[in-house]
Structure formats: structure tokens, C-alpha cells
């Protein structure tokens, strides 16, 4: 599986910025490198964080390092996993801190509601393969 780098679903500043980068030699090199990779690359939509949290609605930014390295877990939002997936250790730790400091209890790993509320959940590396970053 190869990620979809189309910018059609991006709006405003995100779309302009990403399209500018993708047209640059560095952006083209990145896409070529990932396209030529023989392993599966995920998440399927690496710009999902930018799609779900328009620039004008960003209220907080939470950076992750890179997508989860297990197929099916990486969903394009830092720390988030698709509904029904087992919570990864990093997300369990976040939930423990939330419970201890704010008495907020959370058990599901789909954080799309955080993105809708203005939380930009952005990994500093947008794509990965099984067991590695790309």
C-alpha cells in the first residue's frame, strides 16, 4: 500500500503550503523515494491531521515522532489509532497523565474528536513502513 499524497482535501494555508512543498525538488524527491519503496507505507492519508484541523481552527498542537510501525495502527493523526484497535503504550501513558492530573478518563484510541476541537495531532515524520520510518 502506498500513501495518497493528493492535496485535494486540504484547504487554505495547509493546501498552499503543502502544494508549494510538493512542487519543490525536495518534495518530489520525497514522493519518488516513497513511491519506489517496495514495502507497504502508511498511513494511507499522511495529511489527515491537516485535513481534520484546518489552520484557522488550530487551538493546540500535539507533536508525535512518527506513525505507529504496526500495520492498521497508523491513521494520520499523531497518537491516535482507528476505532477498535488496542491502545498503544504511548497513548496509554497520555491517558494515565490525563486521569491523574485532570481526572479525565478515556479508553478509546480514536482521537478524531480532539482534531475536530482544534487539536492538531501532527507527527514530525508523516509516513512509515513496517518497523521503520520513511
Where are these regions (language model features)?
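A polyanion-binding, active-site-adjacent surface
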Residues: 15-134
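Generic N-terminal amphipathic, Lys/Arg-enriched alpha-helix
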Residues: 1-19
